[in-house]
Amino acid sequence: MSSTQDTRLIWIDLEMTGLDTDNDQIIEIATIITDDHLNIVAEGPVLAVHQPDRILNAMDEWNTRQHGQSGLIERVRRSKLTARDVELQTLEFLKKWVNPKTSPMCGNSICQDRRFMHRLMPELEQYFHYRNLDVSSVKELAKRWRPEIMSGLKKNASHLAMDDIRDSISELKYYREYFFIKN
């Protein structure tokens, strides 16, 4: 495989029934591959993971409202895919574009996603390099060191996995332009 596959970045986002990594479940996953300059190379499948009503009915008010309004709960109910099905389909996509263990896990607050994957999709979690490219870390630095640039940042915040990834890529491009020093 070409060295290009060693420099590409895997962007991933999960939507979950909540934030409890020991008990909550993954309900949606999406991936995007970019080159090292953040240009989109490929978009992966957007997959809803079926969950029974007892899991969906246990969601807190925020998740119930957010995922209900976005249509995600209905997609989850209609889905026939298990977490393992979704894991395998995502891996099949990634293997076409990026060599194993070369890309950090990229996204916003990605540690939470990694913890869910470790428990529910371990093979997928192991496909990534151990490092993370967490845009939320850059945001925290920008808020403290250059707060004046934050008003120019616009995000969609739909809490649908593919939209959230696009937002994360756009956000990092924004920080590259307005936060990082160019020589």
Curated annotation (Swiss-Prot):
Coiled coil: none annotated. The active site is at residue 130. GO terms for cellular component: cytoplasm. It is found in: Cytoplasm. Its EC number is 3.1.15.-. Residues 9-172 form the Exonuclease domain. NCBIfam families: PRK05359.1. Belongs to the oligoribonuclease family. This is Oligoribonuclease. The lineage of its organism: Bacteria, Pseudomonadati, Pseudomonadota, Gammaproteobacteria, Moraxellales. The gene is orn.
